[in-house]
Amino acid sequence: MSKPSLTLPRIVLHDLWQHKWILLLALLVLSNAVAVVYTSHVSRKLTTEWDQLLQERDRLDIEWRNLLLEEQSQTEHSRITRIASKDLNMSRPLPSEEIVVKVP
C-alpha cells in the first residue's frame, strides 16, 4: 500500500471535475428556476399595478363625467332666467328704473 490516501474533499473535487457537464447542467437548472421565480414576481407586481391604474382611470372618468354635468347645469343661463321670472316673478329692470348705489 504505497498509494497515498485521498482525503474526502479531494475525492469530491475529483468526481465533480470528471462530471463537469452534469454540474454545469445542475447550475443551469438552478439559475433557470431562480429566473422563473423572479419573472413570476415581476409579472404579479405589474398585474397589481395595472389593476390599480385601471381603478384610478375609472374613478377619474366618473369624476370627469360629473364635472361635465355640473358645468352644463351651471352654464345654463336660460334656466336661471326661467326660474327668476317664473318662480320668483322677477324681471329685468328698464334702464330708467336702475338705481346706482355708491358706497363711500
From Swiss-Prot:
The chain crosses the membrane at residues 21-43. It is a single-pass type II membrane protein. GO terms for biological process: FtsZ-dependent cytokinesis. Residues 1-20 are cytoplasmic. Its main location: membrane. Pfam families: FtsL. The keyword Cell inner membrane applies. Residues 44-104 are periplasmic. It is found in: Cell inner membrane. Part of a complex composed of FtsB, FtsL and FtsQ. Essential cell division protein. May link together the upstream cell division proteins, which are predominantly cytoplasmic, with the downstream cell division proteins, which are predominantly periplasmic. NCBIfam families: ftsL_broad (TIGR02209). Belongs to the FtsL family. This is Cell division protein FtsL. It comes from Shewanella oneidensis (strain ATCC 700550 / JCM 31522 / CIP 106686 / LMG 19005 / NCIMB 14063 / MR-1).
